[in-house]
């Protein structure tokens, strides 16, 4: 059900609790504020199908602004707070957003944005931005006259070039309380419902945290919103609010497990019924250690921003099939295919495809959309894996060379494109290398131009070069030098050969 129905049935029930302060926002308050947001969007001339963007850190008002967009038929783009102004300018331009709401805590970046877009600030003043709170206060809290369902248009992980906006097909039912398949899965498979107290640990600009928290609201539960993840604070929040569900990435588990034993034992986490994780591969020993600590509540799923398919596995199943990301659930069927689109038998490695009833497209990129389909029309995220005889999926590789560091997806091509413009760089490959805490770290392998001496001074210079234009998460943590990168006569870079040097295995796929 849409949150407005919970506002009518249980108006005083907390929809959101701010973890750090205990401040509670009721369903009645969320409904009223989201109506004001919808009224404001209409007053600014936004109509169904238009896009708007949010550049915010975690704040309870995120939900009112997003639900306001959802109930006014808008496509909302949530932008990472880690991006630089040029990176944000690209997304604003590519998406065609007509309105940007930026947080005052991100003032320095927000003021450097040059894209032509109407601008509102939240949580304080930003030069060139109008404060959104006063504008919201001036709006009626009644629903707009032409309510219809909007949705997220999030920017997907890319392996080459810049990220692309994912346009999912609009709901067949335009009503704002239409059936949301993810909410049904959350209820039927993970047991989320009106009694859920859900710990939200990650930034809401990510697809998963935003999608899961909105599902909790659809199901009538309570979201406990952390401003940012801290391992001991997460344990304290579970105990304080008796959280029984939450969403994590493997890096969170690593940080939790690195807490001293006396700290880990200090908090009661017995209320947890499901700790849902995804976003990056979880090392088997890490997942096993979490199950040993929290019990068989460490549940997993595999999906992408594209929403073309979904697999999931409960902890008890995983203990019988360690390493699996589960079986397909929902409307889409799972297929493993070769490069020609032929379906492969069990235990044979190939590309992972889904066959959803309605599929996505990449905004402004029909070629990329076409590349994601095979001859049957099935779509892939570019991952490689195999299934067993019972349909359980095991991933053996990930999207071509995309780096996942701390659950954040990083596009190597963008970093390579910047580094190769440095006068000392003849050629470059950016890969992910193992990192105990973050899962992977960004490594740049540089072929210097003839006559340039490699070494620490050049590495420092190239690091500074990256920091001028790239966000911190994209700046290489390590820079190595080689005499020559392995390229085919056609110019194709055998990046797999480079990456595998850091992972200690021989290349199988180039």
Give the positions of each predicted feature:
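Conserved AMP-binding/adenylation subdomain of ANL enzymes
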Residues: 174-197, 201, 205-245, 259
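Conserved AMP-binding/adenylate-forming
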Residues: 20-23, 39-86, 409
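Gly/Ser/Thr-rich phosphate-binding loop
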Residues: 152-154, 218-219, 243-248, 259-321, ...
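AMP-binding/adenylate-forming catalytic core of the ANL superfamily
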Residues: 83, 100, 236, 246, ...
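ATP-dependent adenylate-forming carboxylate-activation enzymes
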Residues: 56, 77-90, 104-106, 221-241, ...
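ANL superfamily AMP-binding
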Residues: 13, 28-53, 84-85, 89, ...
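ANL superfamily adenylate-forming
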Residues: 109-154, 162, 169-183, 259-260
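AMP-dependent adenylate-forming
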Residues: 3-26, 124
């Amino acid at each position: 059900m849409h949150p407005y129905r919970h506002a009518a049935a249980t108006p005083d029930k907390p929809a959101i609790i701010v973890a750090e302060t205990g401040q509670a926002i009721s369903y009645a308050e969320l409904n009223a504020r989201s109506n004001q947001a919808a009224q404001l969007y209409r007053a600014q001339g936004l109509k169904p199908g238009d896009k708007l963007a949010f550049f915010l850190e975690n704040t309870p008002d995120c939900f009112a602004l997003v639900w306001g967009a959802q109930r006014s038929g808008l496509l909302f783009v949530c932008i990472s707070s880690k991006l630089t102004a040029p990176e944000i300018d690209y997304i604003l331009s590519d998406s065609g957003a007509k309105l940007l709401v930026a947080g005052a805590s991100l003032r320095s970046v927000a003021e450097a944005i040059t894209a032509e877009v109407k601008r509102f600030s939240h949580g304080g003043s930003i030069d060139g931005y109008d404060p959104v709170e006063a504008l919201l206060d001036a709006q009626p809290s009644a629903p707009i006259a032409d309510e219809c369902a909007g949705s997220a248009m999030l920017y997907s992980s890319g392996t080459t070039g810049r990220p692309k906006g994912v346009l999912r097909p609009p709901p067949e039912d335009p009503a704002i309380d239409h059936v949301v398949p993810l909410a049904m899965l959350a209820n039927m498979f993970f047991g989320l419902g009106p009694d859920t107290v859900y710990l939200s640990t990650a930034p809401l600009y990510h697809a998963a945290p935003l999608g899961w928290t909105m599902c909790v609201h659809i199901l009538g539960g309570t979201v406990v919103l952390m401003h940012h993840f801290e391992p001991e604070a997460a344990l304290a929040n579970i105990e304080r609010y008796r959280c029984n569900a939450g969403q994590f990435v493997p890096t969170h588990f690593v940080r939790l497990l690195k807490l001293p034993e006396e700290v880990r034992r200090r908090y009661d986490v017995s209320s947890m019924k499901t700790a849902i994780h995804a976003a990056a591969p979880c090392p088997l020993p890490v997942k096993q250690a979490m199950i040993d600590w929290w019990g068989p509540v460490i549940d997993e799923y595999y999906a992408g921003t594209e929403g073309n398919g979904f697999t999931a596995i409960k902890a008890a199943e995983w203990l019988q099939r360690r390493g699996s990301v589960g079986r397909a659930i929902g409307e889409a069927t799972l297929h493993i295919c070769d490069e020609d689109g032929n379906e492969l038998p069990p235990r044979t490695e190939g590309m992972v495809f889904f066959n959803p009833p309605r599929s996505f497209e990449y905004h402004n990129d029909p070629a990329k959309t076409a590349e994601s389909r095979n001859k049957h029309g099935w779509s892939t995220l570019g991952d490689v894996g195999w299934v067993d005889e019972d349909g359980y999926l095991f991933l053996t590789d990930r999207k071509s060379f995309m780096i996942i560091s701390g659950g954040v997806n990083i596009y190597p091509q963008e970093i390579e494109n910047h580094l190769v413009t440095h006068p000392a760089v003849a050629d470059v490959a950016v890969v992910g290398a193992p990192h105990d805490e973050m899962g992977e770290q960004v490594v740049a392998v540089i072929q210097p131009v003839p006559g340039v001496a490699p070494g620490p001074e050049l590495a420092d210079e190239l690091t500074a070069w990256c920091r001028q234009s790239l966000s911190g998460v994209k700046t290489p943590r390590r820079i190595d030098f080689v005499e020559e990168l392995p390229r085919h006569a056609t110019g194709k870079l055998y990046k797999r050969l480079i990456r595998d040097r850091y992972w200690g295995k021989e290349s199988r796929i180039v």
